[in-house]
Amino acid sequence: MAPTLARPSLSGVQFILSSPTTTCAATSVVTRAIAARSFSTTRSARDSVSIPPDSPNYIKVPEPPQSSEVRHPFVKGHLPIPRSIFPKKGVPEKVQSGYVNRIAPKSAAELAGLPPKSKQESWRRKMAEARRQSLEAGLQGLWQRKVKRDQKQAKESKARYLANKRAAQAPERLDEVFTRATIRESTAKNTFVPLDPEAFVKAEEARIKHAEKEAMKSEARRDAVVQLYVASKNFIVDEKELEEHVNKHFTEKIHNAGLWESGRSIWDSQKNPISMRELRNEFSGFNDRVTATTSAAVKTTVRQKNVAEELTGGKL
């Protein structure tokens, strides 16, 4: 077993420190002896934790051996919400005289003034009378509590309303006036936004315009549905038609056109893309082609189709 470390005696330390002939060497020896610690490389919590001056633990305050704090035990669950037995307005019937006698009437023998026939009947009459008195006292107490609670709530509500009203109508505080940023009069006039006198008229116009846009969108959706319905007659619905279309379009001779069938691309089987010259001619109404798409006959046909679509209510 390893020998224990020598520790200085408290009486000897106190004597050395209180002695007027204490030298620096003796003081340093005692200090080193007091500061002697165990042979460990782990820093203690006191060395690693630094308590700031703003912490309440910076100054050690002695605590009593028994705390005077009263800690209430935690109660599980919750209290049920009491049922409202009185109406919100008016004096209820339950607090009026004669209510208890109507809901808990006495027996015919008791009303006739006949004495009880036995001790058990006497005890029953006594218990019934006690229940009537308890019921009446309970109803009166609940009613008085409700009246006081309503008066307290009304008083607090009125006081809160008056306080809010005074705060809303109170003049500006001096601290706000003195600390407010300075705004020049010219700047205030230039940045002031007056109320628009025609705000409601503009809002009504905007509402009408929005309704027109929504009607146009609805009409466009309806036309799209009708156009889809008309185009559904050309939809592929079985495998036989799908196979015919695949064999027709996915072939090496699909672009063959002309007398010699020498087409190699889609521009050979169909017309060339429109050029800037053709766009300019179409805009001016002039075209040198034999089958002009901007001729009067073509335009008339397009107009007739549009009129027919408007009359029938759908795409053609």
From Swiss-Prot:
Protein's cellular compartments: Mitochondrion
**For this UniProt entry, what's an example GO CC term?**
mitochondrion
The residues forming a coiled coil are none
Mitochondrion as a keyword of this entry, yes or no, is yes
Q: List the disulfide bonds.
A: none
Q: Where is this region: Disordered?
A: 41-71
Give the keywords, sorted: Mitochondrion
The family classification in the record reads: Belongs to the mitochondrion-specific ribosomal protein mS26 family.
Tell me, in a sentence or two, what this protein's role is: Component of the mitochondrial ribosome (mitoribosome), a dedicated translation machinery responsible for the synthesis of mitochondrial genome-encoded proteins, including at least some of the essential transmembrane subunits of the mitochondrial respiratory chain. The mitoribosomes are attached to the mitochondrial inner membrane and translation products are cotranslationally integrated into the membrane.
Assembly with partners or alone = Component of the mitochondrial small ribosomal subunit (mt-SSU). Mature N.crassa 74S mitochondrial ribosomes consist of a small (37S) and a large (54S) subunit. The 37S small subunit contains a 16S ribosomal RNA (16S mt-rRNA) and 32 different proteins. The 54S large subunit contains a 23S rRNA (23S mt-rRNA) and 42 different proteins.
Q: What is this protein called?
A: Small ribosomal subunit protein mS26
Q: Organism classification, top ranks?
A: Eukaryota, Fungi, Dikarya, Ascomycota, Pezizomycotina
